[in-house]
Amino acid sequence: YNINVMVKKEWIEKGYVDEPIDEILDLKAEIRKLCKEKDAIILAHYYTVGEIQDIADFVGDSLALARKAAETEAKVMVMCGVHFMAETCKLLSPDKIVLCPDLNAGCSLADSCKAEDLKKYKEEHPGYQVVSYVNTTAAVKALTDCVVTSGNAKKVIDSFPQDAKIIFGPDYNLGNYINSVTGRNMLLWNGGCHVHEKFSVEAIIKLKQEHPEAVVMAHLECKAPVLAVADVKGSTATMLHYAQEHPEIKEYIIATEAGILHELERNCPDVIFYPVPPEVSEGGVGCSCNECEYMKMNSLKKIYNSLKFGWPTVEVGPEIAKDAVKPIEKMLSLS
């Protein structure tokens, strides 16, 4: 990349490169061309829009994306997801350029646990180890003994001695589920994902009445009553594998962010997937699916501009990076 590209003040204010693009450009083709020129790969989370998943070199959940980031040969990674995922890429491949198409793509779950609060909590609980969900900032990971994703949380926790004292955060629902299946009593941080917290048992029951044959799949970030009525509980990758491995099932009710429907429908074209609508407050107007507005900040235009101008890049300071990478590497070695 030409390091001399002037990063404009307005880009910094907006958090992304906002430059006009010729309307006649075939953005998908141009993005692939830029990837070739810059030796870049595009990593996309299942919750991004379908057209981004279609042009990505690799689509996956947090665990698969972390693995890919650790092993890629490419000089540049464009992380189409949210900010903590781009940080994870940078931690695992510090010598690579990591682009995040829109720096505003945060995460309500990562925001629910501030490093200074966790540091204080750790000091109040000597003798406890910290296990953090991957949906956390690098600064929180630096205070962590081991990281988990929803795809490997049980496996990682099972590797700790049964009498180990553990603080688990920031996702209360995931921690509560892991406590219930492992018989542990981990101390749980009270954080949550604003998308998964909106799923209700009532909405699932209503869909189940309309589609009695459908199998209910729910993400582990959902509340306990929702998980209690689900037939399949797990990460997005768990849901995808289950649907692929059970061709006899023709209908599913899905309680997770709606972006996963793209990959589910692509892999299982003869199956019908019903997204659970979010719970609406009294008098509110509901929509048919539950979306993460942060994931949806990623767009073809922003990806094109980030590749063209080599910005926004994600950096992690060396002091934090040296401590933050250890718990991620520990997780990868365990899973």
Each language-model region and where it sits:
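Short, positively charged and aromatic/hydrophobic N-terminal segments
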Residues: 1-3
